[in-house]
Amino acid sequence: MLCYLLIHILCLQAVLGVPYDVLPLRIPALVPKDTSLLSGRGAFQQLIDHTNLDVGTFSQSYWFNTTYWGGPGSPIIFYTPGQHAATDRLHYLTDTTLPGLVAKEVRGAVVLVEHRYFGESQPFSNLSTANLQYLTLDQVLADFVHFARTVDLPFDLSGQSHPSRAPWIWIGNSYSAALVAWTEKLIPNVFWAYYASGAMVNCMQDFWQFNYPTQQGMPQDCRYSLEAIISHVDSVFLSGSPEQKHRLKTRFGLQDLDRLDDTASALSRPVIAWTLIQPSDTHAQFFEMCDAIGNLNSSWSRGHKVGSEINLQKALGNYANWFTTSYLPGLCESSGYSDWAGRNNVQCLDTANPSWQAFHDLAVQNEDRVWDWMICNFFLLWQTGAPVSRPTIFSRLVDSMYYKRRCKLIFPEEENVTYAARVTDDSINTLTGGWNHTGKRILFTNGEFDPWRSASVSSVFRPDGPMQSTSQQPIILIKGVQHQADMYVRNRINKDVREAMDTGIAQISRWVLDFHVEKSKTLTQYTSQVYCAH
């Protein structure tokens, strides 16, 4: 009977012009699972330019883990590490992270694909401005869609786990979560469902809102001290005497920096460490800084109460001591560039000197240059000081022009090409919908105190307020945590993270079942037509 049905469906396909590779057909697994391929890697010949095939291809690396895979026709859990070399993120193939945990639940295989221009997946031998022209958002999205549609996975020789026959679930975090959302919006109907943790979907140039969740979640005594310190720094640098400016720079070991905006930026940088804190962490640099400012011997707790009135000079002195003894030493030297060598070298904080080796490092291993290209060209999201009407923990001397100046130095014009100097936040938001993302079978999660929340669908700065959850686009706000906490199984020690992960996995499982229900309905319609014709 099955053979009879298949023959007639193929005949119907010929009449209707339905290509075989998109037939909504899920055949029971006839090929046993190859247990010799529990994990491995492959190389996919990816198009350099999806709009011009003549440009050629490059080798895009991918890895897979079929430990929990149910065999041909079972789901594929798709992941890309985004702006990181894949070899540094292979743990996302395992059940120590959400992709592996979802695979375990739905009997799926995890496939991890490296992002173009990162790690081993290099279209060219160097990162010149001219060679980076093919690093665009549309090319990146097209890469992953083309991979899903055309790859021959070595563990699925029958092709029954092709996205037309089995559900592909794309899970992403941070930048890769934004790629998840933008793919669902711009190239739908390839992946079946999506999970986006900490996705920054709304691009902004002066992204002062970045530090707002930090101010809300950090120990409040530390917050008020930092606000007072940054206010003092800005006041001195904007209206103080030359002697006062030099004295303040020297107090923080930054006397070798010529520009005041570079100095102010350097003094603001430590607060960014807030976004790195995970619930399972037993130590965090951010809380070490707060302990130092408050002159405490034990770590700050998230419930630290507001105490006495701020003593600016005491807080400033404590911060300077921590900055010069714990934060600054080795900061520039760790980059490995000879012109930034020396334990107390601060020149990596100088963004205006075009002679620095880092600005001319075109090696394909230079991930910072690749990410700078993406930021300068497309995403912006530059962390700046808050408007004068709001308290700030980031200097107001740092604005979008501060970052644009650096973009021009890193990416000078070559062969009549340069970075997109006239890009605006509206360029991407008009294309993607920005904060107003409405999708199908996509789940968003964000941490309550994640700085990137301010660019997410859960942003309090969204014109209509945080987006409301729907059945097709569930949105989970995880209480009390920072960035992408739900991606790591170790964070399940936190009740709110555990509940969010369980809710998300249950939702993905339902969507996997929906795939087979919908495909069965479609197959039934074909079957009905076959029998009606006879």
UniProtKB/Swiss-Prot annotation:
<dbReference type="InterPro" id="IPR008758">
    <property type="entry name" value="Peptidase_S28"/>
</dbReference>
<feature type="signal peptide">
    <location>
        <begin position="1"/>
        <end position="17"/>
    </location>
</feature>
<feature type="glycosylation site" description="N-linked (GlcNAc...) asparagine">
    <location>
        <position position="416"/>
    </location>
</feature>
<keyword id="KW-0325">Glycoprotein</keyword>
<dbReference type="GO" id="GO:0070008">
    <property type="term" value="F:serine-type exopeptidase activity"/>
</dbReference>
<feature type="active site" description="Charge relay system">
    <location>
        <position position="174"/>
    </location>
</feature>
<keyword id="KW-0645">Protease</keyword>
<comment type="similarity">
    <text>Belongs to the peptidase S28 family.</text>
</comment>
<dbReference type="GO" id="GO:0006508">
    <property type="term" value="P:proteolysis"/>
</dbReference>
<feature type="active site" description="Charge relay system">
    <location>
        <position position="450"/>
    </location>
</feature>
<dbReference type="Pfam" id="PF05577">
    <property type="entry name" value="Peptidase_S28"/>
</dbReference>
<keyword id="KW-0720">Serine protease</keyword>
<feature type="glycosylation site" description="N-linked (GlcNAc...) asparagine">
    <location>
        <position position="126"/>
    </location>
</feature>
<feature type="glycosylation site" description="N-linked (GlcNAc...) asparagine">
    <location>
        <position position="65"/>
    </location>
</feature>
<keyword id="KW-0732">Signal</keyword>
<feature type="glycosylation site" description="N-linked (GlcNAc...) asparagine">
    <location>
        <position position="297"/>
    </location>
</feature>
<dbReference type="GO" id="GO:0008239">
    <property type="term" value="F:dipeptidyl-peptidase activity"/>
</dbReference>
<dbReference type="InterPro" id="IPR029058">
    <property type="entry name" value="AB_hydrolase_fold"/>
</dbReference>
<protein>
    <recommendedName>
        <fullName>Serine protease vicPa</fullName>
        <ecNumber>3.4.-.-</ecNumber>
    </recommendedName>
</protein>
<comment type="function">
    <text>Serine protease, part of the gene cluster that mediates the biosynthesis of the secondary metabolite victorin, the molecular basis for Victoria blight of oats. Within the pathway, vicPa and vicPb are probably involved in the processing of the vicA1 and vicA2 precursors. The pathway starts with the processing of the precursor vicA1 by several endopeptidases including kexin proteases as well as the cluster-specific S28 family peptidases vicPa and vicPb to produce 7 identical copies of the hexapeptide Gly-Leu-Lys-Leu-Ala-Phe.</text>
</comment>
<feature type="glycosylation site" description="N-linked (GlcNAc...) asparagine">
    <location>
        <position position="436"/>
    </location>
</feature>
<comment type="pathway">
    <text>Mycotoxin biosynthesis.</text>
</comment>
<keyword id="KW-0378">Hydrolase</keyword>
<keyword id="KW-0843">Virulence</keyword>
